[in-house]
Amino acid sequence: GVILENDEEIYADNVIMVVGRDGSNWLNGVCNKHGIKMTNNQVDIGVRVETNDIVMEEINKTLYEGKFIYESSVGTKVRTFCSNPSGHVVVENFSGVMLANGHAYNDPKLGSKNTNFALLVSHSFNEPFDRPNEFAMEIGSLSNKLSNGSIIVQRYGDILKGRRSTYKRIKEGFVTPTLKEAVPGDLGLVLPYNVMKSLIEMVEALNYVTPGIASDHTLFYGVEAKFY
């Protein structure tokens, strides 16, 4: 049960606490203080992908948001999430860490010529490390440092070549970034090997479903993370 602020005691077999993602650290402290056993959920780490609407046209028109899951060669699960046809990539401020996200407007007049969606790699931890949210926050913080407090954007072709993207190469690409403040950089310096390898394998697999997504001009914004 629970004891309320006015000292009222409520007895129950099960208690649901709704503290939100920002309240996870507080809840962790409360559980540790009172010896309450906890089970950690997974954390998802990845990127926001952006390409031309025409590449995603069939999926956009038929499904609006396709749901694809891929088992990588390193044993991770990769999934697509939150697709936004004719949408915009945006910045999400999560407890002071800038993360990539995306949205689309209901009014077609406000739309772009690009589709964006998340590619997320799931990670679970046990011992000796059992703080998955902290792990994702550290990766997001590193991305912020390398982009001077912003979001990194990188061409898929530059990722495959192992080089950072530059403003010149981004400008010469066929996909115009909708997040103008994103800073060209190298996500290979931020994302762990298993994450990057999983993302590349997923994009190559998606290319069979929606040809053109594995183009050199496809953009990766990082980092995107989902906390549970």
List PLM regions with ranges.
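Residues forming the flavin
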Residues: 1-228
